[in-house]
Swiss-Prot record:
It comes from Mus musculus (Mouse). One of its GO terms (cellular component) is aminoacyl-tRNA synthetase multienzyme complex. GO terms for molecular function: aminoacyl-tRNA deacylase activity; ATP binding; glutamine-tRNA ligase activity; GTPase activator activity; leucine-tRNA ligase activity. 5-fluoro-1,3-dihydro-1-hydroxy-1,2-benzoxaborole inhibits LARS1 by forming a covalent adduct with the 3' adenosine of tRNA(Leu) at the editing site, thus locking the enzyme in an inactive conformation. This is Leucine--tRNA ligase, cytoplasmic. Residues 262-511 are annotated as: Editing domain. A motif ('KMSKS' region) lies at residues 718-722. Pfam families: Anticodon_1, RBD_LARS1, tRNA-synt_1, ULD_3.
Length: 1178
């Protein structure tokens, strides 16, 4: 904090936050129990149970976690105010591989490098050596050994350095080599950090997962026994993303990169190498050798013309389980070795290493094609990290294949370079396989010709061609080949694949859709694993899950679509693993339940955790009900969570189990679960699936709503430890205070798009909050001087209506969980309404309205900034905590009155702009440019009716609007009709711009812009606020007249809601005003005296030049008894009144503009005042 200037405001907020948190803890405000609520009859307005996916305990919580959980926190804050009994529990997740992997890594580092470890120096050259051939390496001069050490905090490969960056000592770090220490260290820190932001959590219900917590362990075992009993869990070989290094499946949470990536299925087409073999393969004579190509389009294999390899790519030949030799890349062979292709799992028996160029020209037999022999040809764009490195060529349907084949046909030099004979290329033409309506039976040829693709180097055009063809081909394409003629591709694809596999021409091959790296830095493969899996593909289960989703609130259509897509493709999910932390499978204890599977219905455990664990995170303390973990058998859990389950055989007294049951029945289902959108395809979908499986007949226990949010950017950039653009929760609270941070989180964003936490906005928010508290204190101090009596002035009524409208809008925004909008309507716009009232209420603000505003504002802001609001609630002398307050009741809203006030503000803004333009120098020669004299008077003209041409236009538009169900026709139709009306002939240049303006206003304000009269009295609104308008424009006088009294030009331009004005400067005679008071800060000045001036108008004019005068009642004007000689005499100190007469408030000034003389009339007497007067300020 030392680096930041001026922390007084943040320190003030932190101080009141501590006080509020101590108060809530002492009063146990957030601790709720079903039995107590039901006894007190506090559940009449319903309950609200909200949960957040428990964060993983391998580090401190950061701002991203906080943003997601703030959605729960704000929702609970709002629902409390609406009178609901609210429960927000918070657990901490320790299941899975990362903690164990980090602990083991630390252990290895200590074994290898000592304690504390002495790591080998890393030279820059090492960094560069990882660059790929052909990459340009830019040397960063700033990077040497020293900067590496500094950078270790964010991106070190050593676990020791990562722990060091958390501020831990060497002695502390050693303890983390035991996984259990992580469970003791990080969970209490998480609770501590969360408490500093004033989370409305019942901390008695918090727990950590894994078998360290015997109650939770028992709960998860019960869940899995139930799922197995209901046939949801099965055993067998499944295709799974797998880490060979870890020796087990690699689930989403265990991945360094590739979260959400699943296995991609290919058809592995076997292209038999014909004898004579290329010289490189001659040693394998007598063996069946196949080039194996991975394709997503088995239905196009009828059109193969050749096979592609990349000349400069490394390939291997390896022996399969049946003795055949497959040629592909090492990477693909590694995947195949885990899918039963080789004799021994994970072992690739390499029999030959070769470069692609060494098999160019080899002759092949390809299945299904009409060509008996095809050849191996060069393609330079094959990627090593996708497929097998061998690509089968179908130029009729693949733009890439066609472009490469045409290159070879056109370029003799290219064929010569790679030793390709003409007969290997020239006779081969694209073969029609399928027809796409509108494109033809050689789709790739048609599209490549249309886009004028010249060669395989036209990458962008080729990408465009593929995009055009592939989806159209799959959905609209029709087969042309015998046996499948006329059938749609999407219907025959699987059949053709099966036929090829049955004929021994192909196999199923899987690899990850994209690269997946495990947290142990191992590139994952797809493996066929023996494992226990949840059968999410089960048709009935899926159907019921879709039913749950149908009734579930997702708050936005995009989230719903993401859920639908996820539920659609979810099949089997491996729920067991052999490494990490967690609960053992109850019927097969060699397996652990993985972290995405023990976290699907734990919300039910929250309902009873406080009665079992007694507030201890690890579940090691004595249970408040005296229940031991081993007593929680499957039958006991059944009784607690299943309504119709019989009472079990147990030593636990029935009333105690009934207490657990009561808690569950009261709080379930979960009313809201909020989370990042990246959890929709996994955790949140499993959450729905498992609730449906556990309570299949009780849809009233299924999730009610799920709110997904985007990721959080920090200052418009991705949060990243390595770049330093990162804030932990504790750092954010330290920097901005809890409420300052919460305000910025509410303002960061509402949708599933990425939100943005802007530090400058957080700082501005702190200032707003501080200013708000100071203003409340100011109002409390000046309470007695505020206006009382009826609150019925124009601005009183507007302010009351705007408050009521603000309450209603903010209520709607909170209800829809649109928190950025709720902050806008319930704080920013609410404060703006108060500021406007303060500015417009020239007669002073009304006490009742000011204090209603303070109360309402405090409540509306409470979900976002509870500490500050608690402080203000106390300042207001309220006996209870604001946590027991109720949502304010909105009174009537006079929309017409609010619009009349908006009209007033628009007129004031318009007048200021026109005054500015009036004061601009007249256009002309540069030497002539003199600013205009400031006007003193203004006449505002308002129209009762529209000019005739506008009246006719509006009437016409209104008739179209009513005839076309609230829509206006195109401008062409309108112009044609209006142009035919004789009354509008001479106005046609103005008519269509007027129509365009009306259409634009209609989008903003609705159909009322077609009305011929305003809903309020324009003149009355302006007259009631004439003092405000006069003061804000610094004019002497404003009069309001009807346009009918003005000249023709004004009458034609002026229309309802759009007044016109005329500025003018009333002539006057300059008079000196002298202040004889010594050291007063007031000086002599010259002002114009105008016909009919009073003392008050002259003093107001004086106040514009002498800004030191704040109160006109403190100023007195005097005239010299001798107007000619008086001003010439030297003033005598202490005799300011000598030879002068006080001018009474009733005096009227008169001017003779010809002789430039001023006199005043007072009580019927006329007196000359000369060219000088005196003013005294008391």
């Amino acid at each position: 904090m030392a680096g930041r200037k001026g922390t007084a405001k943040v320190d003030f907020l932190k101080e009141i936050e501590k006080e509020a948190q101590q108060k809530w803890e002492a009063e146990k405000v957030f601790e709720v129990s079903a039995s107590r609520l039901e006894k007190q009859k506090q559940s009449s307005k319903g309950k609200y149970f909200v949960t957040f996916p428990y964060p993983y305990m391998n580090g401190r919580l950061h701002l991203g976690h906080t943003f997601s959980l703030s959605k729960c926190e704000f929702a609970v804050g709002y629902q409390r105010l609406k009178g609901k009994s609210c429960l927000f529990p918070f657990g901490l997740h320790c299941t899975g591989m990362p903690i164990k992997a980090c602990a083991d890594k630390l252990k290895r580092e200590i074994e290898l490098y000592g304690c504390p470890p002495d790591f080998p120096e890393e030279e820059e050259e090492e960094e560069e050596s990882s660059a790929k051939p052909g990459d340009i390496v830019v040397r960063d001069k700033a990077k040497g050994k020293k900067s590496k050490a500094a950078a270790k905090a964010g991106s070190s490969k050593y676990q020791w350095d990562i722990m060091k960056s958390l501020g831990l000592s060497d002695d502390d770090i050693v303890k983390f080599s035991e996984a259990e220490h992580w469970l003791d260290y990080f969970p209490p820190l998480a609770v501590q950090d969360l408490k500093t932001i004033g989370l409305k959590v019942d901390w008695r219900r918090s727990f950590i997962t894994t078998d360290v917590n015997p109650y939770y362990d028992s709960f998860v075992r019960w869940q899995f026994l139930t799922l197995r009993e209901r046939n949801k869990i099965k055993f067998g070989k499944r295709y799974t993303i797998y880490s060979p290094k870890d020796g087990q499946p690699c689930m989403d949470h265990d991945r360094q990169t590739g979260e959400g990536v699943g296995p991609q299925e290919y058809t592995l087409v076997k292209l038999k190498v014909l004898e004579p073999y290329p010289s490189k393969l001659s040693g394998l004579k007598g063996k069946n050798i196949f080039l194996v190509a991975a394709t997503l389009r088995p239905e196009t294999m009828f059109g193969q013309t050749n096979c592609w390899v990349r000349p400069d790519m490394k390939y291997i030949g390896f022996e399969t389980a049946n003795g055949d030799i497959f040629i592909c890349t090492q990477r693909a062979a590694r995947n195949m070795s885990y899918q039963g292709f080789t004799k021994h799992n994970g072992v690739v028996p390499v029999v030959k290493e070769l470069m692609g160029e060494e098999i160019l020209g080899a002759s092949l037999s390809a299945p299904l094609t009409c060509y008996k022999v095809v050849y191996v040809l060069p393609m330079l764009t094959i990627k090593e990290d996708k497929g097998t490195g061998v690509v089968t060529s179908v130029p009729s349907d693949s733009p890439d294949d066609l472009a490469a084949l045409r290159d070879l046909k056109k370029k003799q030099a290219l064929r010569t370079k790679f030793g390709i004979r003409d007969d290997m290329v020239l006779p081969f033409e694209p073969v029609p396989v399928l027809e796409i309506p509108g494109i033809g039976n050689l789709p790739a040829v048609t599209v490549c010709d249309e886009l004028k693709i010249q060669s395989q180097n036209d990458r962008e055009k080729l990408a465009e061609a593929k995009e055009k063809l592939y989806l159209r081909g799959f959905y609209d394409g029709v087969m042309l080949v015998d046996g499948f003629k006329g059938q749609k591709i999407q219907h025959v694809k699987k059949t053709i694949q099966k036929n090829m596999i049955d004929a021994g021409d192909a196999l199923i091959y899987m690899e990850p859709e994209k690269q997946v790296m495990s947290r142990s830095a191992d590139e994952c493969v797809v493996a066929l694993c023996d494992q226990w899996y949840l059968d999410y593909g089960d048709e009935n289960w899926k159907k019921q899950t879709f039913q749950c989703l149908k009734n579930m609130e997702t708050f936005c259509e995009e989230s719903r679509k993401n859920f639908e897509a996820s539920l659609d493709w979810l099949q089997e999910h491996a729920c067991s693993r052999t490494y990490g932390l967690g609960t053992r499978l109850p019927w097969d204890e060699q397996w652990l339940i993985e972290s995405l599977s023990d976290s699907t219905i734990y919300m039910a455990f929250y309902t009873v955790a406080h009665l079992l664990q007694g507030g201890d995170l690890n579940g090691q303390a004595e249970s408040p009900l005296g229940i031991r973990p081993q007593q929680m058998t499957k039958d006991v859990w059944d009784y607690v969570f299943f309504k119709d389950a019989p009472f079990p055989k147990t030593q636990i007294p029935k009333e105690k189990l009934d207490q657990l049951k009561q808690e569950f029945e009261f709080w379930y289902p979960v009313d809201l679960r909020a989370s990042g959108k990246d959890l929709i395809p996994n955790h949140l979908s499993y959450y729905i699936y498992n609730h449906v499986a556990m309570w299949p007949e009780q849809s009233d226990k299924w999730p009610v709503s799920v709110r997904a949010n985007g990721h959080l950017l920090l200052n418009s950039e991705k949060m990243s430890k390595s770049t330093g653009n990162f804030l932990t929760l504790s750092q954010a609270v330290d920097k901005f205070s809890a409420d300052g941070m919460r305000l910025a989180l509410a303002d960061a964003g509402d949708t599933v798009e990425d939100a943005n936490f802007v530090e400058a906005m957080a700082d501005a928010g702190i200032l707003r909050l501080y200013t708000w508290v100071e203003w409340v204190k100011e109002m409390l101090a000046s309470c007695s001087s505020l206006r009382s009596g009826p609150a019925d002035s124009f601005n009183d009524r507007v302010f009351a209506s705007e408050m009521n409208a603000g309450i209603i809008k903010t209520d709607q925004n909170y209800e829809k969980m649109m928190f950025k909008e709720a902050l806008k309507t319930g704080f920013f716009e609410f404060q703006a309404a108060k500021d406007k009232y303060r500015e417009l209420a020239t007669e002073g603000m009304h006490r009742e309205l000011v204090f209603r505003f303070i109360e309402v504002q405090t409540i509306l802001l409470t979900p976002f900034c509870p500490h500050l609001c608690e402080h203000i609630w106390t300042l207001l002398g309220k006996p209870d905590s604001i946590m027991h307050a109720s949502w304010p009741v909105a009174g009537p809203v006079d929309e017409s009155l609010i619009r009349s006030s908006q009209y007033l503000m628009e007129v004031a803004h318009d007048l200021r702009l026109r005054l500015k333009n009036y004061m601009m120098p007249a256009k002309g020669k540069k030497t002539d440019k003199q600013p205009a004299q400031r006007p003193s008077h203004c006449t505002i003209y308002v129209a009762k009716n529209y000019p005739v041409w506008q009246h006719i236009t509006l009437t016409t538009l209104r008739s179209h609007f009513e005839a076309n169900n609230g829509k206006l026709p195109d401008n062409k139709v309108i112009a044609s009709e209006l142009g035919s009306l004789p009354e509008l002939k001479k106005y046609m240049k103005k008519v269509m711009p007027f129509v365009a303006m009306i259409k634009e206003n209609m989008e903003k304000k609705g159909p009322r812009v077609l009305d011929l009269e305003l809903e309020f009295d324009e003149q009355a609104v302006l007259m009631e606020n004439i003092v405000y308008l006069t003061n804000s424009l610094e004019l002497e006088h404003i009069e309001v007249k009807f346009a009918s009294e003005a000249e023709d030009k004004v009458r034609e331009e002026c229309c309802p809601g759009k007044p016109l004005n005329v500025f003018r400067t009333e002539p006057g005679v300059p008079v000196s005003l002298v202040n004889p008071q010594p050291s007063s800060g007031h000086f002599s000045t010259k002002i114009d005296i105008r016909q009919g001036d009073s003392c008050e108008s002259i003093i107001r004019r004086l106040m514009k030049t002498d800004r030191g005068i704040k109160d006109l009642s403190k100023v007195k004007l005097m005239r010299f008894d001798d107007p000619l000689l008086g001003p010439r005499r030297v003033p005598v100190l202490g005799r300011e009144h000598s030879e002068k007469t006080l001018i009474s408030e009733n005096a009227v000034f008169h001017v003779d503009l010809v002789s430039k003389k001023v006199h005043l009339t007072e009580n019927g007497l006329r007196t000359d005042i000369g060219d000088t007067m005196v003013y005294l300020v008391h």
